[in-house]
């Protein structure tokens, strides 16, 4: 049984990686909060890389998830793992993704309709930004509706993908050091 | 025999009101004691409760010099002090039954009641003294052989003399009492101590006390008994005289000439006795004489002039007796009499009530004055004779006061005439006519001769000269008052008569000049030879002499005639004039000193006008000069004297400001009046308020204020021009969209409107103020389409906060200085159910400090109703009313609304987060600038609390940050007792880039604000660096862009002095990495890459705006407008993509900040450049949200703060308040309070400073326009036109008014520190209208002008006789037209009265001309510097001198020809 699950997981991973090649999940840079959560199904479960666990809301719609980054980031995808077969009426159907620098200037990026999703839903938010990337400090995922007019929602995994940048030799001007001592040692001689 | 006649009392009701008994007295009436002062019941002491009989009540003076009423009951006594500032009362214990009580010079004597069966041999003392209510009773010692026996009882006390009567020996004894202080008198004390000792060891030295030379009454054993009880001696009685008299009653006394006369009556014998004692200072009085009279009643009558004894003889004759002066019999026979004050009431044998008043209650002040002077000059005995004559003339001959006085004077002279006065009766008509027009003293002389035949004036021989001289000086004094000329003439006539009799030729000649033609002298030869004294002294002549010699020549006053020097005080006018002249001619005294001297002498402006013209002109010239060079130290009196009421009302403001406003209210425009009948929706209710007069005057050149009014109007229908819209407005959804946009815009207006109407109302106690309601009606211009937003759109939630703001605006419109705001007024305005309007109204009142008047229990009623907005409004309102007071009551109220301040483990508060946010902000206001440790700690913990919840959101933490900042506002590192809190380092964690990791970011704005406010203006570089933004892009990415703005602004507020209004400084503030993108003009698209730059720029602008708030600094304005233009341009860039949209939000926010900043700089100035740009911002509809519109309207409001009457202060509190209310995170929707509590946007009211200078006309009290010269401390000179906003008070060096219409007023703020406060408080310059041109060019004579007019009315007036005299009504009327009344009046009188120049008038003119002549040289030249023509023009003076010369010449010529 465990083996099957392992395999399924592997399959899943490969599936994920296929569409996200060249991108890296930067969700760990963010602070995750949600509008409500059922006890035993906290929001951190969307970050545990386990498709069997999930976050469940506990309140009235719309449910929101806030992903707050510590710094400005450029992102390409917001990906969610939804499983209609298991969650049925708990599966979100209408999602609105907003982004901005803070709560004060959240602007709608896109609204997504999903039909009985099984597996990853990749929302290419980068397409709405500049040069295919969206610069954000804060992402808000708002679940406006569920399938079959369900009340609470299940979200199993969420990943935020940013382009994987080959860190070149660190440009001098990018180094935050300002003191003479540090600058003098920031390159290998 | 002459007898005094009495008047019949017609109306018995009135008889008590005829004369007042002037000293106070007490009367026992039943159970009460009445204290009567000046015949009016003053106090009533009631003793019904004590249920004891009142034995005695008296007024006395205790040893301490305090007057008191003493009331003695059975065993208790009450003492009430009746002094001016001492109203204590005491209860004394009376250990015996009191027979009688008498006031003594130092307290009172109490006489014990002796029962008939008392053992006569015990010989206990029965008379005690009480010297102080707190002392015990004391005994009496006797000096000499004679002592009081038990049968002696006090029957009368007067001064030192005590009269006792011995029933057994039928003897009347007189004693002198002396008070000795038992404390100070060593011999007594020691003897007392010895007595104490001796009580234990009596056997050892029983004779010790006997060795004392003083005898005392009781036998040793008994007296010791008293002494053991602690009784001491305090008074010594020494025997004077004893008479064997029995049954004597009704004692009374009069005192005169050092002789005390005590009278007593023995009813059975129908005899009265007078005992005369000579009083000698510090020695025992000695007995002079005793007289016996037949009398059935006796009483003393004391008037100011005479002290007499009224004697009623058995025959019914009443006479006034005194041992020294002649007796005055009264006509008629009488049954009884009584004395009340100086009035004698009589009942004659027919039962008719009559009275006679001895006191000369003359209506005639001249007679009164003359009498008092004569009283001073004559010895008492002579004066009594003189006054007796006066009384005879009054009452026996029924003369008037004047005639009586003249007769009594003449009588002194006629006495020395041998021949009978022969006055022939008036025979023919001609003579009668000629007599009636002339002065003559026929009647008076006739009576005088009768008087002199009755009274013995023989001692007057030596006093004739002083009497005449005294009258002469009185007449001289009268010459100094032009009003009393008829009285003076009468007196001069009397003098002429006297001097003719005395054969004093020089005096006769002198008086002849005055009245020769109108006086008929009656010849009489006087047998006594009185040598003529030195020539008649003329005060006017003396003034001329002084002016000529420019020094005070000696004046032959009364003292030079052998009269006492102190006599001169009897002539106040002469004395003060001499002092003034001395002042004028003293080279060391300035003209200002002269004015001070005048005030000291009590000479008012009115009094000056009564001086003879010459003196008047000199004094007015001085006053005129002093008016221009007033001394800054002068009090009101001096300033009033020189007629500088403007300076006076500035330096000594008396009327509160709101009094002025009432007057303004009366001025209503026609528009306002008609508004009541026309449709109310069409009337702009905002456009008229009490200050409209002033604000209209400030912006009199254009209609900018009307425009602002229109923009900030939320209560009337809005018309929009459809052609300005690209979209098609014909479809209903589109219309609805527009309507909703406009609706949101309207909702954002109230805060701004509140700024415009700030402090414009002074409601009456009965006036209900009602909020103006929103009107969302929209009129599409071409056409008549009127649309409303959907009912579903306008929900209660949508309008709740805007309504709150409307309420605040209404509350703030009530002036800070309103006096009528109290609990009942607030309750009167309270609606049935609590609304957001009322909540805001409470907050608004609180901001202006009016909630201090709210009773505590009313606040509980408000709070227990749990109406959210009401709680917020009330808590914030109370906190701001009690700003910085740490009031315990309000602290409690706030604490129960903040969970953080409740003890750990207490129940969850069921209070909304917003109320808690308001509560924690309220704590900051309440503890403002207190450095309260506990509150600082709590607020800091709240900022840094990491668990973000619904309650502790960003807004709550920000409020906590503000609170922390307010508590320690501007203290910097100087925080007493808080070093262990590590405020800086802990707050720094909250704002570091790591904050997000620790979930602290929500607290970052609060932490930044707290640090900024604590270190505000400290120029602390260390802390500024900590707040400042990092310089590298990598690190910058870690910060939320909007926090960058706060950090930049915060850093600059700390480095307050570094902030400069120039581009160099601005550029220096921008981090190097952004410099390349610095130019906003080049931005073609909105990009989120520029977010940081925009925020940095807005931050710089925000700090500039606050740094130069209210200064109107032109450079700062230029920079800010430059940025504002750039940002407005950026706002118009398309925002389609997400990135652009996100950037657009920031751009709009930054635009608002820059707009607000530029308004801040120009606060109250209503600057047109800023106004134009704000109008553009107001006109936007999409995609602007509620917050942005709110900011625009706040900017508009600040720009026109209070209609241009207010500006912003730059105190720490003001900057903090501005920081809070302009906090650059505006709500996105009307319900949004997430980042910042909307209610706190109204705190700007704490930063308002009233700085508009309003000149007012002194006469009309109406504001007026006057050019001003304002010198700043930097030396810059500004020319302004008041009313206008002044620069900040601290930067002004002096303010002076210019222009010709008003007296120039210069206020030097640098030299007088008080002036700055005065100006800050009043902001009013009261100006005196002054017509500089009139005094110089006005024609010499009004006649030619009037004669030219040809109206028939004028002709009539011209021919009438009235017009010919100088005081004609016409002249008075024409005078009043002129501003400079006195000057013109004097000129007219001077020029018109040449036809009948009297000598005095001529002298007066000579004084004037001499003055002008003297002004060319000497002391007067130095003082006047040819300014002597200020009051009278040079032409006039020259013309006058010519006329005088002509007159004198012709006069002399006539005389020669005659």
Curated annotation (Swiss-Prot), chain A:
Intrachain disulfide bonds? none
SUPFAM superfamilies, per the entry: Galactose-binding domain-like
Q: Which GO terms describe its cellular component?
A: anaphase-promoting complex; cytosol; nucleus
An example GO biological process term is: anaphase-promoting complex-dependent catabolic process
Sorted keywords for this record are:
Cell cycle, Cell division, Mitosis, Ubl conjugation pathway
InterPro entries associated with the record: APC10/Doc1, APC_su10/DOC_dom, Galactose-bd-like_sf
Keyword Methyltransferase attached: no
- State the PROSITE patterns in the record: DOC (PS51284)
Q: Does the keyword Cell division apply?
A: yes
The UniProt record lists the DOC domain at 2-187
Stored SMART domains: APC10
Function according to Swiss-Prot or TrEMBL = Component of the anaphase-promoting complex/cyclosome (APC/C), a cell cycle-regulated E3 ubiquitin-protein ligase complex that controls progression through mitosis and the G1 phase of the cell cycle. The APC/C is thought to confer substrate specificity and, in the presence of ubiquitin-conjugating E2 enzymes, it catalyzes the formation of protein-ubiquitin conjugates that are subsequently degraded by the 26S proteasome. Acts as a positive regulator of the anaphase promoting complex (APC)-cyclosome. Involved in G1 cell cycle arrest in response to nitrogen starvation.
Q: How is the subunit organization of this protein annotated in UniProt?
A: The APC/C is composed of at least 13 subunits: apc1, apc2, nuc2, apc4, apc5, cut9, apc8, apc10, apc11, hcn1, apc13, apc14 and apc15. Interacts with nuc2.
Q: Which protein family is it in?
A: Belongs to the APC10 family.
User: What is the name listed in the Swiss-Prot or TrEMBL entry for this protein?
Assistant: Anaphase-promoting complex subunit 10
Give the gene name. apc10
Curated annotation (Swiss-Prot), chain B:
The record's GO molecular-function terms, alphabetically, read: molecular adaptor activity; proteasome binding
A Gene Ontology biological process in which this protein takes part is: mitotic sister chromatid separation
Q: Which domain of life is it from?
A: Eukaryota
Cite a GO CC annotation: cytosol
Regions of biased composition (Basic and acidic residues) lie at 196-210
The alphabetized UniProt keywords are: Cell cycle, Cell division, Mitosis, Repeat, Ubl conjugation pathway
PC repeats sit at 873-895, 959-982, 1006-1024, 1099-1124
Spell out the InterPro entries in the cross-references. Answer: Apc1, Apc1_3rd, ARM-like
Query: What PANTHER family does the record tag this protein with?
Result: ANAPHASE-PROMOTING COMPLEX SUBUNIT 1, MEIOTIC CHECKPOINT REGULATOR TSG24 FAMILY MEMBER
Q: Which family does it belong to?
A: Belongs to the APC1 family.
What this protein is called in its record is Anaphase-promoting complex subunit 1
Q: Please name the source species.
A: Schizosaccharomyces pombe (strain 972 / ATCC 24843)
